[in-house]
Amino acid sequence: MKTIILAIAVFATVGVSAQSDKYVNAMQATITQFDSAKSPADFQNVSAAFVRIANAEKTQWLPYYYAGLALSREGWMDQSLDKDANSGKIESFCDQAEANAGSPSDKAEIYVLRNMAETQQMMVDPQSRWQTNGQAASADLEKGMSLDSTNPRLYYLKGMSLFNTPEQFGGGKDKAKPEFEKAVELFKTFTVKPLYPNWGQQQAIAMLAKCQ
C-alpha cells in the first residue's frame, strides 16, 4: 500500500513539474517576443499570446500583467487607438492579475500598470480629465507605494507625471528630479526574480539626465 501511495506521489510531483516547466518555457518565449516587439501590431499579438498562457494557467498573475503591459505599449505607439477602450482592457487584466497575486510587492507591480492605464486615458484631454483619470493615476502610485515602497518603477512614473506637469500646476524638472533620483538608486539594489518585470532603469536614467 505504501508503495502505491509513493508511486502516486511521485507521478503527481512529475506532473506538477512538467506543467511548471511548460509555463516557464512559454513565459520566457513570450517575454522574448515582447522585448523584440516594435510595432502596435507586434504588441497586440504579444498581448494575445500572454492571454493564451493566462487561460491555460488560470492561477498565475504574471501573464495577465504582461498582457496588459503589451496593450499599454501599443496604446502609446498607436495614436489612432481608442485609449478609453484600450485602458479598459488593461484594467481588466489588472483585476485578473491582482486576484491571483499573492504578495504585496506583486500587487504593487500591478498598480504600476494601473497608473499607466489611467495616464493614457488622461492624455486624451489632460485639461478635462485631470480631475478624473489624473487623480486616479496619482492614487494608483500612492497605493503601489503603500504596498511596496522599494519598487523603482513607481518613482519613475511619479517623476514622469511631475516632469510633464507645468510648473504653475506643481510640476516641472525640479519637482521631478528627486523622484528620478530615487528610482535610479532603487534600481541599483532591486532584485528581479525570474519572469518578473525588468524595465524602467534606462528610462529613469535618461529622464534624470534631462533634469540636470
Spans of features found by a protein language model:
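Bacterial Sec-dependent N-terminal signal peptides
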Residues: 1-26
